[in-house]
Amino acid sequence: NGYKEDFYLADNQPDSAFLDKLPFEHYVVVRPENIKASYVEGRQSIVPELLKELDAAGYNILFLPRYESDRDYAQGIKNIYMPKEAVNGLDACYYADAILTGAGTMAREAACLGVPSVSFFAGAHLLSVDQSLVDAGKMFFSRDVAQIMQYLEHAKDSFFEYRAGGIAGLERCKQVQQEILDVLEQQIRAYLKSQN
């Protein structure tokens, strides 16, 4: 009753010093879609418009460009931080107020942690695992910036609820991991018993 991300998130120990590396305590993460991928035919990135709207609404943005050229999207944006070095993506998810990404893994990680998660995946179809998270209400999907901003406004209340009890997402991941380990142990025991 979980996702592959639950299994490895269960063992993650968030770095309590992560926020010390950022210029702000509250932020949303923006990770561009992979416009250069073969499964994306002729689509334009929504990130330039999304960054402008987030900036206008007063959000602090941790921007994680995929390509060097993605850095151009940040020109003129005031409340944005682009790390010079790679950051721990799991810590970025754990401490974020929301994740907005064109990448599936980060959106799923956030959803599993209980962090408001927005996917603006640019492919023709969502992966079935992402669609199941959307159907369960754990992830929001849209490539329409106005819809994304509206979702964020409605999700704002949960930003602070999550921060107050953020460990709940990790506890759920640990429960999923334990269920998997229990099933594996049962299967191994049954196999070993059949070999005697």
Give residue spans per PLM region.
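Short, acidic/turn-prone active-site loops that include or flank metal/cofactor-
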Residues: G2-E5, E85-G89, A122-L127, V145-A146
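C-terminal amphipathic helix plus adjacent low-complexity
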Residues: S158-N196
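Active-site regions of enzymes building and remodeling cell-envelope glycoconjugates
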Residues: N1-Y3, Y73-A86, D135-M139
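A donor-sugar binding/catalytic signature common to diverse glycosyltransferases
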Residues: A92-V129
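Catalytic donor nucleotide-activated moiety binding site of glycosyltransferases and closely related
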Residues: L51-P83
